[in-house]
């Protein structure tokens, strides 16, 4: 069985503030540890049509999230989710990673 890691550097720009578990240092530490495993397949997120988001989320929700990313500083999207200017690219790459993973499994690449 092959295992893939689908990732980009955008995740380190998703800032959530001190004390929050989603930290760039954590992502970097995990990535560095995984790079030691030579049997993993590394890939980048897929590009995708943004309309695909509306197949799994309400259109109003998708539009609200797209408009919510701050130009500076941190912002609560809801009671649990903190976003920053870098969160937009990180979210796009997260969706692209899921799409790449599904495609890779379907095509038996991993």
Language-model features, listed with the residues they occupy:
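HDAC/HDAC-like amidohydrolase catalytic core signature
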Residues: 1-110
């Amino acid at each position: 069985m092959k295992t893939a890691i689908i990732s980009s550097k955008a995740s380190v720009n998703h800032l959530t503030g001190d004390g929050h578990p989603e930290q760039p240092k954590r992502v970097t530490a995990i990535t560095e540890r995984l790079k030691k495993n030579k049997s993993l397949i590394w890939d980048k997120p897929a590009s995708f049509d943004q309309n695909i988001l509306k197949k799994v989320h309400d259109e109003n929700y998708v539009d609200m999230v797209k408009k919510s990313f701050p130009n500076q500083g941190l912002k609560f999207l809801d009671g649990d989710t903190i976003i920053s200017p870098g969160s937009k690219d990180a979210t796009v790459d997260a969706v692209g990673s899921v799409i790449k993973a599904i495609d890779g499994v379907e095509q038996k690449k991993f």
